[in-house]
Each structure stands twice: as structure tokens, then as C-alpha cells.
């Protein structure tokens, strides 16, 4: 490999959410969704060049990052977007919250499929909208999928938005065209705006799976979709706070931009430098990352099968976040239990997945092996 994914600098003391949570405690953090890899050297070089300029004034959206995004969408996903459809944002979480304000009124409802990334569940409440949760179901291949029949049973006249996570966090599914078409048809039948969070779209390690930008499924769904993306998960850049939305519909775009005014800050100059370098020069690094993550996923899958049959781990195709069903362990508080045994995992309860934990395998393999052994020791310690 050209790039090294087997080491990572010490992150303690740098304000790292992931690592400083357990500062001073003997707990290995394998929780929140950022990776323990240095970013692509090409991105670091671009940031250094911007730093060397020495002037860090107010920055407005400009041509270079917009061109990088448009070319990336075309090259990577066959999605022909226009610069006028883009809105640069400091993150996708504020964007989801903004959508609840922009496209619904107080008292109306927002639907999503669970378990899911917690901000999907909190955003409607923050906006004083009602949340409708529809559980994912299992298909014949024992993969998680969207339950359209359950969605039909739950939708109401006051439902205005469906929020989709594609690829899905935390279950790691890459929805195929048939599944996305079913969601699109559902939204059209009930006149719903589709908010499609596709931040994990470039982290597909299954070579048989392919990401489909939801708004490309049909012209009709494109006219009612807000697509949300960012390079932050793929290139390990969440601290740069640079994301974007793509909204084709003129009226929806105007409502979104009107809601932003005075609330959302502009993207900073380093965010623009990072997104431009990632999409223009980061592809070789990304391909090697996927190869490494594929190896890590295989390690997790094999370890659970052979060493921890008490944990249910279903097949996944994307992300670096493994979703474990630990119901059979009989733990009152699984996250707390594993922390007591030296490993920090993400609690599934805020995802609407009690008795589940999420493990981040975006880390050097030796660290992952250590974490899996700690989990195994914790499971065995139940009987001591």
C-alpha cells in the first residue's frame, strides 16, 4: 500500500471527542464515528498551503470547491448536479434540523426508519414536530431493509417529511435500486419531502454493492429530495465542518436558504480547502482505505462468528460501524458493562436500538484486535 493505516498519532489532549471522553481511564475508545487514521496526505498538503497563506478572513462559497463537488458527483456517482443546486454547510446535523423547520409546521410529523443515527430522532422534537418511527425489517438474506408496508400503516395526513439514511447508519446497508424506488414511490404517494443523508456513500467496502444517489431514481423524486453529503466520514475530516446539500427543486431550495439566514455560519476557509482536495485528489487514498476497512470488517465478522456467537452481527456492506445485538448477553446496561471491562462502544439506545452497541472498526488493525479481545473477555466475565 502507498498509504499507512496501521498507525495513528496520539489523539489524547487534542480535544478529541472520541479519545478525551476516556482521558485518564483505561478504556479503549471504539465508539463515535471518526476514524483513527491520519487523513490523506494530499488533503494535509492543501490545508498546509492554505495555512501558509496567512490570512484567514471571512470566506464565501466560491468556484473551486463547487467545481470539485460537481465533478465528484458526476465521476463517482453519475449524478449531474448544477452549481446553483448546492448549499455549503458546516455539517449535516444542522441541515437535518433546518429541514424540519423549513419544510414542516409545528404539530406536523416527520417519519424515519429505526434504528438510526440519533439526530434523525431528535431533530423533529427540537422543532416541535412529532416523530413517527418505523422499524427496519429483515429480508430473506437476513439483511436490514425498509418496511414499506409498515411505513404505509404509520403515515398520516400531517406527515410532511421522510428522513432516509443511505447507506444506513448504524446497520451498514447499501439500499439497492428496488428499495430506493419503493421509498421514492412512497414519498410521491403521500406528497412527502425526502431528506436523504448520504454521508457514508463513499465508504462501501462490499465489492458487489453500489451506492445510488436517491434523487437519481426518478425525475419525480428528484423534485422532492434534499440530498445531504460531506467528505467528513470518508476522509476523516469532521473537525473541518464542511458539508453540502443538493436541492434541485427551486422552491424547496429557496425555503431552505431562507431558513438558513442568520442561523447557520459560513463554512470556514479550511473546510473549503479540505473538501476541494478530498474530491480532487483523494481517490487513491480512499481506495486503499476501503481495502483496509474490508480487512477490518472481515476480522470483526469472523471473530464474532467464532468467538462470540452470543452476539448477533448481521451482514453489512458499508460504513466502518458494526452494529451488535447483545440481547442474549442479559446485560442491564451493555455500554456501561463493556466500559467497566476496558472498551468504549456506542450505546444503541439513542438509535432506538436498546440492547445493541456499535463498534467503530475504522482504526489500525492491532487496535481493533485488542478491542475485540476486550469484548470477548467481558462476555466471558459474565459467568465469573
PLM regions with names:
Residues 153, 336-346, 350-384:
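PLP-dependent enzyme catalytic core of the Aspartate aminotransferase-like
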Residues 276, 292-301, 313-325:
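Conserved glycine-rich beta-strand-loop-beta hairpin in the small C-terminal domain of fold type I
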Residues 82-83, 315-321, 352-354:
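Short Gly/Ser/Thr- and Asp/Glu-enriched loop/turn motifs at secondary-structure junctions
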Residues 45, 219, 223-294, 302, ...:
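Conserved core segment of the aminotransferase class I/II
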Residues 56-185, 202-203, 209-220, 373:
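Conserved core of the PLP fold type I
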Residues 2-91, 98, 280, 382-384:
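N-terminal small-domain helix-loop-helix segment of the aminotransferase-like
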Residues 127, 189-190, 221, 341, ...:
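Helix C-cap/helix->beta junction micro-motif
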Amino acid at each position: 500500500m502507498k498509504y499507512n493505516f496501521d498507525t495513528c498519532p496520539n489523539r489524547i489532549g487534542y480535544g478529541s471527542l472520541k479519545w478525551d471522553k476516556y482521558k485518564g481511564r483505561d478504556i479503549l475508545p471504539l465508539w463515535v464515528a471518526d476514524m483513527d487514521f491520519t487523513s490523506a496526505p494530499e488533503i494535509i498538503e492543501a490545508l498546509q498551503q492554505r495555512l501558509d497563506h496567512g490570512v484567514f478572513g471571512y470566506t464565501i462559497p466560491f468556484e473551486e470547491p463547487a467545481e470539485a463537488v460537481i465533478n465528484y458527483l458526476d465521476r463517482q456517482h453519475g449524478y449531474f448536479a448544477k452549481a446553483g443546486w448546492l448549499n455549503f454547510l458546516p455539517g449535516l446535523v444542522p441541515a437535518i434540523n433546518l429541514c424540519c423547520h423549513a419544510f414542516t409546521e409545528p404539530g406536523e410529523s416527520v417519519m424515519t426508519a429505526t434504528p438510526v443515527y440519533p439526530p434523525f430522532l431528535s431533530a423533529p422534537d427540537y422543532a416541535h414536530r412529532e416523530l413517527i418511527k418505523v422499524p427496519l425489517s429483515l429480508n430473506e438474506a437476513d439483511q436490514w431493509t425498509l418496511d414499506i408496508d409498515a411505513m404505509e400503516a404509520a403515515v398520516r395526513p400531517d406527515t410532511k417529511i421522510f428522513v432516509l439514511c443511505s447507506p444506513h447508519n448504524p446497520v451498514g446497508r447499501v439500499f439497492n435500486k428496488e428499495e430506493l424506488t419503493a421509498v421514492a414511490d412512497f414519498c410521491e404517494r403521500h406528497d412527502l419531502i425526502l431528506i436523504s443523508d448520504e454521508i457514508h456513500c463513499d465508504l462501501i467496502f462490499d465489492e458487489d454493492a453500489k451506492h445510488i444517489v436517491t434523487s437519481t431514481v426518478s425525475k419525480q423524486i428528484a423534485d422532492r429530495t434534499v440530498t445531504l453529503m460531506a467528505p467528513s466520514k470518508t476522509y476523516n475530516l469532521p473537525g473541518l465542518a464542511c458539508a453540502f446539500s443538493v436541492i434541485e427543486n427551486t422552491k424547496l431550495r429557496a425555503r431552505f436558504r431562507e431558513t438558513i439566514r442568520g442561523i447557520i455560519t459560513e463554512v470556514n476557509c479550511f473546510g473549503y480547502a479540505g473538501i476541494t482536495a478530498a474530491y480532487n485528489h483523494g481517490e487513491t487514498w480512499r481506495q486503499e482505505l476501503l481495502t483496509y476497512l474490508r480487512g477490518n470488517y472481515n476480522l470483526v465478522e469472523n471473530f464474532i462468528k467464532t468467538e462470540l456467537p452470543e452476539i448477533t452481527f448481521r451482514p453489512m456492506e458499508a460504513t466502518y460501524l458494526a452494529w451488535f445485538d447483545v440481547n442474549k448477553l442479559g446485560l442491564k446496561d451493555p455500554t456501561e458493562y463493556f466500559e467497566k471491562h476496558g472498551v468504549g462502544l456506542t450505546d444503541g439506545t439513542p438509535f432506538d436500538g436498546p440492547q445493541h452497541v456499535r463498534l467503530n472498526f475504522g482504526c489500525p488493525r492491532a487496535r481493533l484486535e485488542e478491542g475485540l479481545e476486550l469484548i470477548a473477555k467481558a462476555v466471558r466475565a459474565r459467568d465469573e
